[in-house]
Amino acid sequence: MKKQRNLRSMAAQAVEQVVEQGQSLSNILPPLQQKVSDKDKALLQELCFGVLRTLSQLDWLINKLMARPMTGKQRTVHYLIMVGLYQLLYTRIPPHAALAETVEGAVAIKRPQLKGLINGVLRQFQRQQEELLAEFNASDACYLHPSWLLKRLQKAYPEQWQSIVEANNQRPPMWLRVNRTHHSRDSWLALLDEAGMKGFPHADYPDAVRLETPAPVHVLPGFEEGWVTVQDASAQGCMAWLAPQNGEHILDLCAAPGGKTTHILEVAPEAQVVAVDIDEQRLSRVYDNLKRLGMKATVKQGDGRYPSQWCGEQQFDRILLDAPCSATGVIRRHPDIKWLRRDRDIPELAQLQSEILDAIWPHLKSGGTLIYATCSVLPEENSLQIKAFLQRTADAELCETGTPEQPGKQNLPGAEEGDGFFYAKLIKK
């Protein structure tokens, strides 16, 4: 039996690690969830994701409610108060229970002397909630995005930035990819229906299913047997452009965690696939996905800027480059991105993408296809990146995705209920 732990203090410490230390929630949360009971796993996730989604609002409220900020060793208390405010604002947890558990969190973080302070701040919010929220909603903080990102979105999308921001602040739907080597989408949907769940097929992507209500993977029919994989609809769109064929040599570059690697093999089971990623730790997830789906690929650790180190002079029929990016298209799925990224990261990422594109292009066969993809919505990483590449690369030709002046296809967050995603299809003359 799991030891009873204070979930509010655990959430506060996790959020603090993201905001103050720049750690990714996807690395922090799973080990924490192993320490709590199954019924508490979902609440811990809700508290962490929710606080990060609404962080700027909670921070704004604390600055109004407290004379001076908590600093030094007491900084965790700042995040504990955030957890308390989030519960009062956004959950169905009875206010008395939210207050009691949050105040007790002070004991768990060894700050019992601050229980009175935490209780006082949260009760003050309850008394002043209406006036405070009215003032907040009239401020720029109401968009729940850092100012640098808001400015970039406003510049890139003067007519659409508000809808992008709104989509980023929503809870994401759960999309699945049916493994066509096991089941047709319709036959798997019938199994889902028998299991008491409902799913909806995507209009354009033949393997994509949206669950009516997100569910743990272990309850999905045949998940452990590889019948279905969790993957957003926009990410599944890569295969429509890549169009892999049996017998081809295909490179999946920046492949971890392996969702697109396995999708290639579902579409073309006899393709010779090489999956490469710079992060050796994340490559373990590629192996896990291949094993669960019963598939084989050559998996290598390597830097996309130096392909000769891991593939020599080899050339490929098709290359999928899912480039390292700001991930500004998947904020609704990973709200910590808003607080992990900095404005200065964007030109650095654009430079890295440019170097990888230039380095990998010679490894594409004449007549071959390269799909450049990101989960970003920023032009510097997307259309401007491809426009510059086409201008300096004489044997590269844009195909089916946009125009030379506005290259690529940009999906915005929430469009057709998918994530923000960019694709450009390039052919080597």
Swiss-Prot record:
GO biological process per UniProt: regulation of DNA-templated transcription; rRNA base methylation
Keyword field: Cytoplasm, Methyltransferase, RNA-binding, rRNA processing, S-adenosyl-L-methionine, Transferase
Its EC number(s): 2.1.1.176
Residues at the catalytic site: 375
InterPro entries: MeTrfase_RsmB-F_NOP2_cat (IPR049560), MeTrfase_RsmB-F_NOP2_dom (IPR001678), NusB-like_sf (IPR035926), NusB_RsmB_TIM44 (IPR006027), RCMT (IPR023267), rRNA_ssu_MeTfrase_B (IPR004573), rRNA_ssu_MeTfrase_B_ent (IPR023541), RsmB-like_ferredoxin (IPR054728)
Record bears the keyword rRNA processing: yes
Main subcellular localisation: cytoplasm
Role summary: Specifically methylates the cytosine at position 967 (m5C967) of 16S rRNA.
Entry's family note: Belongs to the class I-like SAM-binding methyltransferase superfamily. RsmB/NOP family.
UniProt name for this protein: Ribosomal RNA small subunit methyltransferase B
